[in-house]
């Protein structure tokens, strides 16, 4: 079978080594004669899987001991509700930074529970889309927390700054598309959440990192499966968790540690992004409209000079084993998602194709 590189924004490519191991273990896990999908989540065998996965995740991000890690249902959208339901307390407002599609989606959900103070961080720099630096974010005095999205998958916009607003500001962030791709100072945040389907594992699992002093504040009507305290008190097993996604994510954590950890992966991700943006920037045929300071290393949207060629580009790239390059319906064009599991060889195959496509159609 010819090599295929999957540039999907999520569910995304998984490491080949992980898929091969999962395939080997699928029908007979650890000589039990059953699949890991079939064993009880409360049995000692799966408890070991769960504990190892959490410890490996903690090791990868150097998560401080005063933070809890929760393995949840609901995806990022579930946490759009989970954050206000757990953190508002007796306050009625929170600060929300709007820098793109997913930040705006979080704001829309938050409006069901509070009156969000919206910080419009979208700006233009030299004709390209950008984000205001954090020092220009105007925070309100009465906000229960601050929420932002460090990486916008659709817009291809990243906020790489580390928040430093002082101990009185509870910072929450949607790291769904950038978790484990670069070093992260967890201690600067109150809550970090991430859907698994981009840099962690398959869809169906959501990880939440929550500072323990923020537990016990959930709204009385908060659904139990979104209540951080309930989930923590039950070791993320208040109801049956997505066990197969949890298991596969654990394999990804071990794979990532074997690659040298997050710092090593960050260097590779920088190389991949530089390679792809380099081809775009050195061409009049392709363009990216995000200012360099805010370009995403995970999701690279680009347009062709003649959008009439979009269909041809997608057909030819797919035939060449370069899949899922169609841009989001909101913005059109192309998008290459190059998460941790995408090898640099995949990006090189894409850039070689792009150069050849321009030669033939430019």
Swiss-Prot record:
The UniProt note on the cofactor reads as follows: Binds 1 pyridoxal phosphate per subunit.
Quick check: keyword Cytoplasm in the entry? yes
Q: Which residues bind L-glutamate?
A: 9, 42
Q: Which cysteines are joined by disulfide bonds?
A: none
Localization recorded for this chain is: Cytoplasm
Which cofactors, by name?
pyridoxal 5'-phosphate
Q: Quote the EC number.
A: 2.6.1.52
Part of which pathway? Amino-acid biosynthesis; L-serine biosynthesis; L-serine from 3-phospho-D-glycerate: step 2/3; Cofactor biosynthesis; pyridoxine 5'-phosphate biosynthesis; pyridoxine 5'-phosphate from D-erythrose 4-phosphate: step 3/5
Tell me the Gene Ontology biological-process terms attached to this UniProt entry.
Answer: L-serine biosynthetic process; pyridoxine biosynthetic process
**Record function comment:** Catalyzes the reversible conversion of 3-phosphohydroxypyruvate to phosphoserine and of 3-hydroxy-2-oxo-4-phosphonooxybutanoate to phosphohydroxythreonine.
The UniProt entry's sequence similarity note says: Belongs to the class-V pyridoxal-phosphate-dependent aminotransferase family. SerC subfamily.
Q: What is this protein called?
A: Phosphoserine aminotransferase
Please tell me the species this chain comes from. Salmonella arizonae (strain ATCC BAA-731 / CDC346-86 / RSK2980)
């Amino acid at each position: 079978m010819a090599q295929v590189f999957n540039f999907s924004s999520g569910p995304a490519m998984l490491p080949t080594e992980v898929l091969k191991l999962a395939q080997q273990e699928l029908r007979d896990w650890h000589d039990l004669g059953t699949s890991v999908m079939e064993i009880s989540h409360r049995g000692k065998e799966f408890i070991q899987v769960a504990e190892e996965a959490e410890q490996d995740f903690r090791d990868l991000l150097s998560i401080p001991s005063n933070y809890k890690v929760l393995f949840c249902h609901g995806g990022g959208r579930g946490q759009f509700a989970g954050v206000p339901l757990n953190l508002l307390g007796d306050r009625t407002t929170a600060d929300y930074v709007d820098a793109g599609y997913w930040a705006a989606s979080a704001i829309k959900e938050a409006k069901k529970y509070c009156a969000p103070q919206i910080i419009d961080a979208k700006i233009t720099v030299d004709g390209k889309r950008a984000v205001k630096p954090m020092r220009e974010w105007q925070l309100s005095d009465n906000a229960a927390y601050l929420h932002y999205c460090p990486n916008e998958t659709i817009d291809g916009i990243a906020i790489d700054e580390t928040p430093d607003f002082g101990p009185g500001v509870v910072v929450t962030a949607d790291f769904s598309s950038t978790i484990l791709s670069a070093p992260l100072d967890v201690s600067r945040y109150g809550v970090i959440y991430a859907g698994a389907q981009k840099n962690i594992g398959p869809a169906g699992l959501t990880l939440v990192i929550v500072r323990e002093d923020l537990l016990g504040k959930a709204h009385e009507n908060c659904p139990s499966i979104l209540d951080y305290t309930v989930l923590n008190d039950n070791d993320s097993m208040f109801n049956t968790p997505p066990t197969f996604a949890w298991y596969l994510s654990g394999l990804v954590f071990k794979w990532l540690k074997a690659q040298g950890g997050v710092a090593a992966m960050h260097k590779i991700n920088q190389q991949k992004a530089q390679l792809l943006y380099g081809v775009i920037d050195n061409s009049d045929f392709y363009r990216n409209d995000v200012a360099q300071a805010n370009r995403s290393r995970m999701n690279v949207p680009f347009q062709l000079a003649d959008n009439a060629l979009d269909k041809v580009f997608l057909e030819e790239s797919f035939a060449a084993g370069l899949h899922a390059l169609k841009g989001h319906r909101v913005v059109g064009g192309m998008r290459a998602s190059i998460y941790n599991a995408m090898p640099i060889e995949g990006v090189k195959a894409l850039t070689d194709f792009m150069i050849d496509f321009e030669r033939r159609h430019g």
